[in-house]
Amino acid sequence: MTQTLLAIEDLSVGFRHQQTVRTVVNDVSLQIEAGETLALVGESGSGKSVTALSILRLLPSPPVEYLSGDIRFRGESLLHASDQTLRGVRGNKIAMIFQEPMVSLNPLHILEKQLYEVLSLHRGMRREAARGEILNCLDRVGIRQAAKRLTDYPHQLSGGERQRVMIAMALLTRPELLIADEPTTALDVSVQAQILQLLRELQGELNMGMLFITHNLSIVRKLAHRVAVMQNGRCVEQNNAATLFASPTHPYTQKLLNSEPSGDPVPLPEPASTLLDVEQLQVAFPIRKGILKRIVDHNVVVKNISFTLRAGETLGLVGESGSGKSTTGLALLRLINSQGSIIFDGQPLQNLNRRQLLPIRHRIQVVFQDPNSSLNPRLNVLQIIEEGLRVHQPTLSAAQREQQVIAVMHEVGLDPETRHRYPAEFSGGQRQRIAIARALILKPSLIILDEPTSSLDKTVQAQILTLLKSLQQKHQLAYLFISHDLHVVRALCHQVIVLRQGEVVEQGPCARVFATPQQEYTRQLLALS
Protein backbone atom coordinates (compact mmCIF):
# COMPACT_ATOMS: atom_id res chain seq x y z
CA MET A 1 0.00 0.00 0.00
CA THR A 2 1.29 3.47 -0.92
CA GLN A 3 2.30 5.47 2.12
CA THR A 4 0.43 8.75 2.64
CA LEU A 5 3.08 11.44 2.64
CA LEU A 6 0.93 14.46 3.45
CA ALA A 7 -2.64 14.61 4.75
CA ILE A 8 -4.56 17.87 5.17
CA GLU A 9 -7.64 17.13 7.27
CA ASP A 10 -10.64 19.50 7.44
CA LEU A 11 -8.38 22.57 7.52
CA SER A 12 -9.89 26.01 8.16
CA VAL A 13 -7.72 29.14 8.28
CA GLY A 14 -8.75 32.72 9.09
CA PHE A 15 -7.26 36.22 9.20
CA ARG A 16 -8.08 38.26 12.30
CA HIS A 17 -8.73 41.98 11.82
CA GLN A 18 -9.50 43.68 15.14
CA GLN A 19 -12.51 41.77 16.55
CA THR A 20 -13.47 39.84 13.40
CA VAL A 21 -11.99 36.75 11.77
CA ARG A 22 -12.27 36.36 8.00
CA THR A 23 -12.16 32.68 6.95
CA VAL A 24 -10.03 32.22 3.82
CA VAL A 25 -9.67 28.41 3.84
CA ASN A 26 -12.78 26.46 4.78
CA ASP A 27 -12.83 22.75 5.64
CA VAL A 28 -10.24 21.65 3.05
CA SER A 29 -9.03 18.04 2.94
CA LEU A 30 -6.25 16.85 0.61
CA GLN A 31 -3.69 14.08 0.58
CA ILE A 32 -0.50 13.37 -1.36
CA GLU A 33 1.23 10.02 -1.68
CA ALA A 34 4.98 9.55 -2.16
CA GLY A 35 5.85 9.95 -5.84
CA GLU A 36 2.52 11.62 -6.63
CA THR A 37 1.76 15.11 -7.97
CA LEU A 38 -1.38 16.86 -6.76
CA ALA A 39 -2.23 20.04 -8.68
CA LEU A 40 -4.09 22.71 -6.73
CA VAL A 41 -5.90 25.10 -9.08
CA GLY A 42 -8.32 27.97 -8.66
CA GLU A 43 -8.57 31.69 -9.17
CA SER A 44 -6.57 34.30 -7.31
CA GLY A 45 -7.81 34.57 -3.71
CA SER A 46 -9.30 31.07 -3.65
CA GLY A 47 -7.02 29.98 -0.79
CA LYS A 48 -4.44 27.93 -2.71
CA SER A 49 -1.33 29.69 -1.39
CA VAL A 50 -2.71 30.02 2.16
CA THR A 51 -3.30 26.25 2.19
CA ALA A 52 0.24 25.61 0.95
CA LEU A 53 1.89 28.06 3.36
CA SER A 54 -0.03 26.51 6.26
CA ILE A 55 1.73 23.18 5.70
CA LEU A 56 5.00 24.60 7.08
CA ARG A 57 3.28 27.22 9.28
CA LEU A 58 4.86 30.04 7.31
CA LEU A 59 1.98 32.48 7.81
CA PRO A 60 2.35 35.10 10.57
CA SER A 61 0.22 34.41 13.64
CA PRO A 62 -1.38 36.84 14.37
CA PRO A 63 -3.19 37.79 12.15
CA VAL A 64 -3.51 34.18 10.92
CA GLU A 65 -5.49 31.73 13.03
CA TYR A 66 -5.85 27.98 12.40
CA LEU A 67 -9.52 27.53 13.20
CA SER A 68 -9.87 23.76 12.84
CA GLY A 69 -8.37 20.64 11.31
CA ASP A 70 -4.81 19.34 11.12
CA ILE A 71 -1.93 18.80 8.69
CA ARG A 72 0.07 15.56 9.00
CA PHE A 73 3.39 14.70 7.38
CA ARG A 74 4.09 10.95 7.53
CA GLY A 75 1.48 10.75 10.28
CA GLU A 76 2.98 13.49 12.47
CA SER A 77 1.08 16.74 13.05
CA LEU A 78 2.72 19.88 11.66
CA LEU A 79 0.12 22.34 12.94
CA HIS A 80 0.84 21.34 16.52
CA ALA A 81 4.57 20.57 16.16
CA SER A 82 7.24 22.42 18.14
CA ASP A 83 9.41 25.04 16.44
CA GLN A 84 12.39 22.68 16.76
CA THR A 85 10.51 19.89 14.95
CA LEU A 86 9.44 22.30 12.21
CA ARG A 87 13.04 23.46 11.70
CA GLY A 88 13.99 19.87 10.98
CA VAL A 89 11.20 19.54 8.41
CA ARG A 90 11.46 22.91 6.64
CA GLY A 91 13.82 22.76 3.70
CA ASN A 92 15.06 19.30 4.67
CA LYS A 93 12.02 17.07 4.20
CA ILE A 94 9.60 19.61 2.72
CA ALA A 95 10.92 22.28 0.39
CA MET A 96 8.96 25.14 -1.10
CA ILE A 97 9.22 27.18 -4.28
CA PHE A 98 7.48 30.49 -3.72
CA GLN A 99 5.39 32.43 -6.22
CA GLU A 100 7.48 35.62 -5.87
CA PRO A 101 11.21 34.95 -6.33
CA MET A 102 12.44 37.93 -4.32
CA VAL A 103 10.77 36.49 -1.21
CA SER A 104 13.29 33.62 -1.31
CA LEU A 105 16.42 35.35 -2.59
CA ASN A 106 18.47 37.71 -0.41
CA PRO A 107 19.20 40.89 -2.40
CA LEU A 108 22.42 41.48 -0.42
CA HIS A 109 24.20 38.21 -1.30
CA ILE A 110 25.55 36.70 -4.52
CA LEU A 111 23.91 33.53 -5.81
CA GLU A 112 26.79 31.20 -4.89
CA LYS A 113 26.65 32.23 -1.23
CA GLN A 114 22.89 31.67 -1.03
CA LEU A 115 22.97 28.30 -2.77
CA TYR A 116 25.99 27.11 -0.77
CA GLU A 117 24.17 28.01 2.45
CA VAL A 118 21.42 25.52 1.55
CA LEU A 119 23.90 22.67 0.98
CA SER A 120 25.93 23.56 4.07
CA LEU A 121 22.92 23.69 6.40
CA HIS A 122 20.90 20.76 5.07
CA ARG A 123 23.50 18.36 3.63
CA GLY A 124 26.68 19.37 5.47
CA MET A 125 28.67 19.79 2.25
CA ARG A 126 31.99 21.61 2.01
CA ARG A 127 32.37 24.51 -0.41
CA GLU A 128 34.32 22.72 -3.17
CA ALA A 129 31.92 19.77 -3.37
CA ALA A 130 28.98 22.14 -3.10
CA ARG A 131 30.18 24.26 -6.02
CA GLY A 132 29.99 21.30 -8.41
CA GLU A 133 26.50 20.40 -7.17
CA ILE A 134 25.37 24.03 -7.52
CA LEU A 135 26.67 24.36 -11.09
CA ASN A 136 25.05 21.07 -12.08
CA CYS A 137 21.68 22.11 -10.63
CA LEU A 138 21.79 25.60 -12.20
CA ASP A 139 22.61 24.03 -15.55
CA ARG A 140 19.70 21.59 -15.19
CA VAL A 141 17.22 24.41 -14.52
CA GLY A 142 18.40 26.28 -17.61
CA ILE A 143 20.71 29.04 -16.33
CA ARG A 144 23.07 29.85 -19.21
CA GLN A 145 26.79 30.21 -18.38
CA ALA A 146 26.10 29.15 -14.79
CA ALA A 147 29.73 29.51 -13.64
CA LYS A 148 29.76 33.17 -14.65
CA ARG A 149 26.43 33.87 -12.95
CA LEU A 150 27.49 32.64 -9.49
CA THR A 151 28.78 36.11 -8.58
CA ASP A 152 25.56 37.84 -9.72
CA TYR A 153 23.10 39.38 -7.28
CA PRO A 154 19.36 38.63 -7.62
CA HIS A 155 18.62 42.07 -9.11
CA GLN A 156 20.96 41.25 -12.02
CA LEU A 157 18.74 38.34 -13.09
CA SER A 158 15.53 38.50 -15.06
CA GLY A 159 12.29 37.46 -13.34
CA GLY A 160 12.39 34.07 -15.03
CA GLU A 161 16.04 33.50 -14.14
CA ARG A 162 15.28 34.31 -10.50
CA GLN A 163 12.55 31.67 -10.53
CA ARG A 164 14.95 29.11 -11.98
CA VAL A 165 17.51 29.86 -9.25
CA MET A 166 14.75 29.49 -6.67
CA ILE A 167 13.78 26.10 -8.10
CA ALA A 168 17.44 25.03 -7.94
CA MET A 169 17.62 26.17 -4.30
CA ALA A 170 14.62 24.03 -3.34
CA LEU A 171 15.82 20.94 -5.22
CA LEU A 172 19.36 21.02 -3.78
CA THR A 173 18.04 19.56 -0.51
CA ARG A 174 16.49 16.55 -2.32
CA PRO A 175 13.21 16.86 -0.35
CA GLU A 176 10.54 14.19 0.20
CA LEU A 177 7.79 16.71 -0.59
CA LEU A 178 8.07 19.74 -2.85
CA ILE A 179 5.48 22.51 -2.59
CA ALA A 180 5.64 24.46 -5.84
CA ASP A 181 3.61 27.69 -5.79
CA GLU A 182 3.42 28.87 -9.43
CA PRO A 183 7.04 27.77 -10.12
CA THR A 184 6.90 28.30 -13.89
CA THR A 185 4.91 31.53 -13.84
CA ALA A 186 7.59 33.84 -15.26
CA LEU A 187 9.11 31.34 -17.67
CA ASP A 188 8.69 31.23 -21.41
CA VAL A 189 7.18 28.09 -22.91
CA SER A 190 10.49 26.50 -23.96
CA VAL A 191 12.12 26.85 -20.52
CA GLN A 192 8.83 25.86 -18.90
CA ALA A 193 9.05 22.54 -20.74
CA GLN A 194 12.62 22.03 -19.43
CA ILE A 195 11.56 22.75 -15.84
CA LEU A 196 8.60 20.37 -16.00
CA GLN A 197 10.85 17.64 -17.39
CA LEU A 198 13.37 18.31 -14.61
CA LEU A 199 10.67 18.07 -11.93
CA ARG A 200 9.42 14.79 -13.42
CA GLU A 201 12.97 13.36 -13.45
CA LEU A 202 13.67 14.38 -9.86
CA GLN A 203 10.32 13.05 -8.73
CA GLY A 204 11.22 9.69 -10.25
CA GLU A 205 14.72 9.69 -8.70
CA LEU A 206 13.62 10.70 -5.20
CA ASN A 207 10.07 9.25 -5.13
CA MET A 208 9.18 12.83 -4.21
CA GLY A 209 5.63 13.97 -3.61
CA MET A 210 4.65 17.29 -5.12
CA LEU A 211 1.94 19.86 -4.40
CA PHE A 212 1.85 21.93 -7.58
CA ILE A 213 -0.09 25.20 -7.37
CA THR A 214 -0.78 26.79 -10.73
CA HIS A 215 -3.32 28.62 -12.86
CA ASN A 216 -1.91 27.10 -16.07
CA LEU A 217 -4.14 24.18 -16.95
CA SER A 218 -1.90 22.99 -19.79
CA ILE A 219 0.82 22.35 -17.19
CA VAL A 220 -1.66 20.47 -15.01
CA ARG A 221 -2.49 18.18 -17.94
CA LYS A 222 1.20 17.34 -18.45
CA LEU A 223 2.30 16.96 -14.84
CA ALA A 224 -0.45 16.10 -12.36
CA HIS A 225 -1.75 12.71 -11.29
CA ARG A 226 -4.67 14.26 -9.40
CA VAL A 227 -6.27 17.72 -9.38
CA ALA A 228 -8.05 19.66 -6.64
CA VAL A 229 -10.04 22.77 -7.59
CA MET A 230 -10.52 25.57 -5.04
CA GLN A 231 -13.05 28.40 -5.06
CA ASN A 232 -13.62 30.95 -2.28
CA GLY A 233 -11.59 28.91 0.21
CA ARG A 234 -13.35 25.61 -0.43
CA CYS A 235 -12.29 22.55 -2.42
CA VAL A 236 -15.18 22.25 -4.91
CA GLU A 237 -13.90 19.30 -6.96
CA GLN A 238 -11.15 16.69 -6.65
CA ASN A 239 -10.37 13.83 -9.02
CA ASN A 240 -7.64 12.17 -11.04
CA ALA A 241 -6.42 14.47 -13.81
CA ALA A 242 -7.72 12.50 -16.79
CA THR A 243 -11.26 12.23 -15.38
CA LEU A 244 -11.43 15.86 -14.27
CA PHE A 245 -10.35 17.21 -17.67
CA ALA A 246 -12.62 14.81 -19.57
CA SER A 247 -15.78 15.30 -17.51
CA PRO A 248 -15.66 18.10 -14.91
CA THR A 249 -18.74 18.08 -12.66
CA HIS A 250 -18.63 21.48 -10.92
CA PRO A 251 -19.67 24.61 -12.89
CA TYR A 252 -16.59 26.48 -11.66
CA THR A 253 -14.27 23.75 -12.95
CA GLN A 254 -16.03 23.91 -16.31
CA LYS A 255 -15.54 27.70 -16.35
CA LEU A 256 -11.82 27.31 -15.60
CA LEU A 257 -11.34 24.80 -18.39
CA ASN A 258 -13.04 27.13 -20.88
CA SER A 259 -11.17 30.33 -19.94
CA GLU A 260 -8.44 31.65 -22.25
CA PRO A 261 -7.40 35.23 -23.18
CA SER A 262 -9.36 36.36 -26.23
CA GLY A 263 -10.55 39.42 -28.10
CA ASP A 264 -8.73 42.16 -29.98
CA PRO A 265 -6.79 45.29 -28.94
CA VAL A 266 -8.83 48.47 -28.41
CA PRO A 267 -9.24 50.63 -31.55
CA LEU A 268 -6.46 53.19 -32.00
CA PRO A 269 -7.52 56.84 -31.69
CA GLU A 270 -7.32 58.84 -34.92
CA PRO A 271 -5.08 60.65 -35.39
CA ALA A 272 -2.66 58.96 -32.95
CA SER A 273 0.39 61.12 -32.21
CA THR A 274 3.81 59.63 -31.44
CA LEU A 275 4.36 59.51 -27.67
CA LEU A 276 7.62 57.55 -27.40
CA ASP A 277 10.43 57.33 -29.95
CA VAL A 278 13.34 54.99 -29.17
CA GLU A 279 16.41 54.74 -31.40
CA GLN A 280 19.34 52.31 -31.07
CA LEU A 281 18.76 51.58 -27.37
CA GLN A 282 21.59 49.56 -25.84
CA VAL A 283 22.17 48.39 -22.26
CA ALA A 284 25.38 46.80 -20.94
CA PHE A 285 26.22 45.70 -17.40
CA PRO A 286 29.85 45.79 -16.21
CA ILE A 287 31.57 42.50 -15.34
CA ARG A 288 33.76 42.98 -12.26
CA LYS A 289 36.49 40.62 -11.03
CA GLY A 290 39.23 40.47 -8.45
CA ILE A 291 39.43 41.75 -4.89
CA LEU A 292 39.05 45.35 -6.07
CA LYS A 293 36.10 44.42 -8.32
CA ARG A 294 37.62 46.12 -11.36
CA ILE A 295 35.57 46.20 -14.57
CA VAL A 296 37.06 43.65 -16.98
CA ASP A 297 34.28 43.47 -19.57
CA HIS A 298 30.64 44.34 -20.28
CA ASN A 299 27.65 42.04 -20.70
CA VAL A 300 25.48 43.59 -23.43
CA VAL A 301 21.89 42.58 -22.65
CA VAL A 302 19.96 44.93 -24.97
CA LYS A 303 21.37 45.49 -28.45
CA ASN A 304 20.21 48.42 -30.59
CA ILE A 305 16.43 48.30 -30.19
CA SER A 306 14.37 50.92 -32.06
CA PHE A 307 10.60 51.52 -32.04
CA THR A 308 7.87 54.15 -31.80
CA LEU A 309 4.77 54.05 -29.59
CA ARG A 310 1.70 56.19 -30.19
CA ALA A 311 -0.83 57.55 -27.69
CA GLY A 312 -3.49 54.91 -27.01
CA GLU A 313 -1.37 52.12 -28.53
CA THR A 314 0.04 48.94 -26.98
CA LEU A 315 3.44 47.59 -27.97
CA GLY A 316 4.23 44.03 -26.87
CA LEU A 317 7.77 42.96 -25.99
CA VAL A 318 7.97 39.16 -26.08
CA GLY A 319 10.76 36.63 -25.76
CA GLU A 320 12.16 34.06 -23.41
CA SER A 321 13.38 34.81 -19.91
CA GLY A 322 16.64 36.79 -20.01
CA SER A 323 15.99 38.16 -23.51
CA GLY A 324 16.18 41.79 -22.34
CA LYS A 325 12.46 42.61 -22.09
CA SER A 326 12.41 43.93 -18.52
CA THR A 327 15.81 45.59 -18.94
CA THR A 328 14.40 47.57 -21.87
CA GLY A 329 11.56 48.76 -19.64
CA LEU A 330 13.96 49.80 -16.86
CA ALA A 331 16.09 51.71 -19.38
CA LEU A 332 13.05 53.63 -20.65
CA LEU A 333 12.25 54.57 -17.04
CA ARG A 334 15.85 55.77 -16.64
CA LEU A 335 16.25 53.40 -13.69
CA ILE A 336 19.38 51.91 -15.30
CA ASN A 337 21.99 53.47 -17.59
CA SER A 338 21.68 53.00 -21.33
CA GLN A 339 22.92 54.32 -24.64
CA GLY A 340 20.86 55.52 -27.59
CA SER A 341 17.97 57.95 -27.91
CA ILE A 342 14.76 58.02 -25.83
CA ILE A 343 12.34 60.82 -26.78
CA PHE A 344 9.11 61.06 -24.76
CA ASP A 345 6.44 63.44 -26.09
CA GLY A 346 9.11 65.42 -27.94
CA GLN A 347 11.44 65.63 -24.90
CA PRO A 348 14.83 63.78 -25.03
CA LEU A 349 15.27 61.91 -21.73
CA GLN A 350 18.79 60.52 -21.95
CA ASN A 351 20.68 63.57 -20.67
CA LEU A 352 18.23 64.74 -18.01
CA ASN A 353 19.32 64.58 -14.37
CA ARG A 354 17.09 63.42 -11.51
CA ARG A 355 15.67 66.90 -10.83
CA GLN A 356 14.91 67.50 -14.51
CA LEU A 357 13.21 64.08 -14.79
CA LEU A 358 10.87 64.65 -11.82
CA PRO A 359 8.18 66.63 -13.73
CA ILE A 360 8.08 63.84 -16.35
CA ARG A 361 8.07 60.89 -13.92
CA HIS A 362 4.34 61.04 -13.19
CA ARG A 363 3.59 60.69 -16.93
CA ILE A 364 5.52 57.38 -17.22
CA GLN A 365 4.45 54.80 -14.67
CA VAL A 366 5.24 51.12 -14.23
CA VAL A 367 3.48 47.99 -12.97
CA PHE A 368 6.09 45.40 -12.06
CA GLN A 369 5.97 41.64 -12.51
CA ASP A 370 6.19 40.93 -8.79
CA PRO A 371 3.66 42.90 -6.69
CA ASN A 372 4.97 41.32 -3.50
CA SER A 373 8.31 43.08 -4.06
CA SER A 374 6.95 46.36 -5.43
CA LEU A 375 4.40 46.97 -2.64
CA ASN A 376 5.80 48.05 0.73
CA PRO A 377 4.52 45.49 3.29
CA ARG A 378 4.63 48.11 6.07
CA LEU A 379 2.23 50.49 4.32
CA ASN A 380 -1.50 49.94 4.00
CA VAL A 381 -3.25 50.22 0.63
CA LEU A 382 -4.22 53.86 1.17
CA GLN A 383 -0.61 54.81 1.90
CA ILE A 384 0.71 52.79 -1.06
CA ILE A 385 -1.64 54.29 -3.64
CA GLU A 386 -1.35 57.88 -2.39
CA GLU A 387 2.46 57.78 -2.22
CA GLY A 388 2.92 59.27 -5.71
CA LEU A 389 0.49 62.09 -4.93
CA ARG A 390 2.63 63.10 -1.95
CA VAL A 391 5.61 63.56 -4.29
CA HIS A 392 3.97 65.02 -7.39
CA GLN A 393 1.03 66.91 -5.85
CA PRO A 394 2.32 67.98 -2.40
CA THR A 395 -0.33 70.70 -1.99
CA LEU A 396 -3.19 68.18 -1.72
CA SER A 397 -4.67 67.69 1.75
CA ALA A 398 -4.93 64.22 3.33
CA ALA A 399 -8.70 64.23 2.69
CA GLN A 400 -8.21 65.12 -0.99
CA ARG A 401 -5.63 62.36 -1.40
CA GLU A 402 -7.97 59.84 0.24
CA GLN A 403 -10.84 60.81 -2.09
CA GLN A 404 -8.59 60.24 -5.12
CA VAL A 405 -7.52 56.86 -3.70
CA ILE A 406 -11.16 55.82 -3.19
CA ALA A 407 -12.00 56.85 -6.77
CA VAL A 408 -9.09 54.97 -8.33
CA MET A 409 -9.78 51.85 -6.23
CA HIS A 410 -13.33 51.85 -7.63
CA GLU A 411 -11.88 52.23 -11.12
CA VAL A 412 -9.61 49.18 -10.85
CA GLY A 413 -12.25 47.00 -9.19
CA LEU A 414 -11.08 47.11 -5.57
CA ASP A 415 -13.34 47.66 -2.58
CA PRO A 416 -12.33 51.04 -1.03
CA GLU A 417 -13.34 49.64 2.38
CA THR A 418 -10.14 47.54 2.22
CA ARG A 419 -7.86 50.60 1.93
CA HIS A 420 -6.64 50.27 5.51
CA ARG A 421 -5.47 46.67 5.02
CA TYR A 422 -1.91 45.61 4.19
CA PRO A 423 -0.59 43.84 1.04
CA ALA A 424 -0.19 40.49 2.83
CA GLU A 425 -3.97 40.37 3.32
CA PHE A 426 -4.64 40.39 -0.45
CA SER A 427 -4.35 37.77 -3.17
CA GLY A 428 -1.87 38.07 -6.03
CA GLY A 429 -4.54 39.39 -8.39
CA GLN A 430 -5.74 41.95 -5.87
CA ARG A 431 -2.16 43.10 -5.22
CA GLN A 432 -1.71 43.62 -8.96
CA ARG A 433 -4.85 45.79 -9.00
CA ILE A 434 -3.31 47.83 -6.17
CA ALA A 435 -0.16 48.27 -8.28
CA ILE A 436 -2.26 49.39 -11.28
CA ALA A 437 -4.16 51.85 -9.06
CA ARG A 438 -0.88 53.29 -7.76
CA ALA A 439 0.26 53.92 -11.35
CA LEU A 440 -3.12 55.22 -12.56
CA ILE A 441 -3.67 57.78 -9.79
CA LEU A 442 -0.93 60.01 -11.27
CA LYS A 443 -2.79 60.20 -14.62
CA PRO A 444 0.12 58.91 -16.74
CA SER A 445 0.39 58.94 -20.54
CA LEU A 446 2.47 55.74 -20.67
CA ILE A 447 2.39 52.68 -18.41
CA ILE A 448 5.12 50.05 -18.67
CA LEU A 449 3.50 46.72 -17.78
CA ASP A 450 6.12 44.11 -16.87
CA GLU A 451 4.38 40.69 -16.93
CA PRO A 452 1.36 42.13 -15.07
CA THR A 453 -0.77 39.00 -15.56
CA SER A 454 1.89 36.28 -15.42
CA SER A 455 1.18 35.31 -11.81
CA LEU A 456 -2.60 35.28 -12.24
CA ASP A 457 -4.97 32.44 -13.04
CA LYS A 458 -6.83 32.54 -16.35
CA THR A 459 -10.12 33.92 -15.04
CA VAL A 460 -8.46 36.77 -13.12
CA GLN A 461 -6.04 37.31 -16.02
CA ALA A 462 -9.04 37.91 -18.28
CA GLN A 463 -10.45 40.39 -15.75
CA ILE A 464 -7.15 42.32 -15.58
CA LEU A 465 -6.90 42.41 -19.40
CA THR A 466 -10.46 43.75 -19.62
CA LEU A 467 -9.56 46.35 -16.98
CA LEU A 468 -6.41 47.41 -18.87
CA LYS A 469 -8.34 47.73 -22.13
CA SER A 470 -11.08 49.81 -20.54
CA LEU A 471 -8.55 52.10 -18.80
CA GLN A 472 -6.64 52.48 -22.06
CA GLN A 473 -9.75 53.50 -23.97
CA LYS A 474 -10.96 55.84 -21.22
CA HIS A 475 -7.64 57.64 -20.64
CA GLN A 476 -5.93 57.19 -24.05
CA LEU A 477 -3.07 55.36 -22.31
CA ALA A 478 -0.10 53.95 -24.17
CA TYR A 479 1.19 50.60 -22.87
CA LEU A 480 4.56 48.91 -23.25
CA PHE A 481 3.46 45.35 -22.47
CA ILE A 482 6.25 42.94 -21.50
CA SER A 483 5.21 39.29 -21.58
CA HIS A 484 6.09 35.74 -22.52
CA ASP A 485 2.42 34.78 -22.88
CA LEU A 486 1.57 35.09 -26.56
CA HIS A 487 -2.16 34.56 -25.99
CA VAL A 488 -2.25 37.69 -23.81
CA VAL A 489 -0.14 39.67 -26.30
CA ARG A 490 -2.49 38.76 -29.15
CA ALA A 491 -5.50 40.00 -27.13
CA LEU A 492 -3.97 43.33 -26.07
CA CYS A 493 -1.20 44.54 -28.39
CA HIS A 494 -1.26 46.50 -31.65
CA GLN A 495 2.48 46.10 -32.36
CA VAL A 496 4.92 43.42 -31.22
CA ILE A 497 8.70 43.03 -30.93
CA VAL A 498 10.18 39.54 -30.52
CA LEU A 499 13.47 39.59 -28.57
CA ARG A 500 16.11 36.90 -28.21
CA GLN A 501 19.27 37.41 -26.16
CA GLY A 502 18.86 41.18 -26.36
CA GLU A 503 18.35 41.41 -30.12
CA VAL A 504 15.24 42.06 -32.19
CA VAL A 505 14.30 38.88 -34.05
CA GLU A 506 11.05 40.16 -35.55
CA GLN A 507 9.01 43.34 -35.32
CA GLY A 508 5.72 44.57 -36.78
CA PRO A 509 1.93 44.70 -36.45
CA CYS A 510 0.74 42.03 -34.02
CA ALA A 511 -1.83 40.54 -36.42
CA ARG A 512 0.78 40.13 -39.17
CA VAL A 513 3.49 38.64 -36.91
CA PHE A 514 1.05 36.09 -35.47
CA ALA A 515 -0.49 35.20 -38.83
CA THR A 516 2.68 35.03 -40.96
CA PRO A 517 5.83 35.01 -38.80
CA GLN A 518 8.97 35.55 -40.87
CA GLN A 519 11.57 34.10 -38.47
CA GLU A 520 12.02 30.52 -37.28
CA TYR A 521 12.35 31.58 -33.62
CA THR A 522 8.98 33.36 -33.76
CA ARG A 523 7.42 30.27 -35.32
CA GLN A 524 8.86 28.13 -32.50
CA LEU A 525 7.40 30.43 -29.82
CA LEU A 526 3.99 30.35 -31.50
CA ALA A 527 4.09 26.56 -31.83
CA LEU A 528 4.88 26.09 -28.12
CA SER A 529 2.28 28.59 -26.88
Predicted regions and their residues:
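ABC ATPase NBD coupling module
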Residues: 64, 78-95, 121, 242-248, ...
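Conserved ABC transporter NBD signature motif
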Residues: 66-77, 340-349, 360
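Conserved ABC ATPase "signature" region
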Residues: 129-148, 399-417
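Conserved ABC ATPase signature
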Residues: 152-157, 161, 422-426, 430
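A short, proline-enriched helix->beta-strand linker immediately N-terminal to the Walker B motif
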Residues: 172-176, 441-445
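A short, surface-exposed alpha-helical micro-motif characterized by mixed small hydrophobic
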Residues: 220-222, 489-491
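ABC ATPase "signature
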Residues: 235-239, 247, 504-508
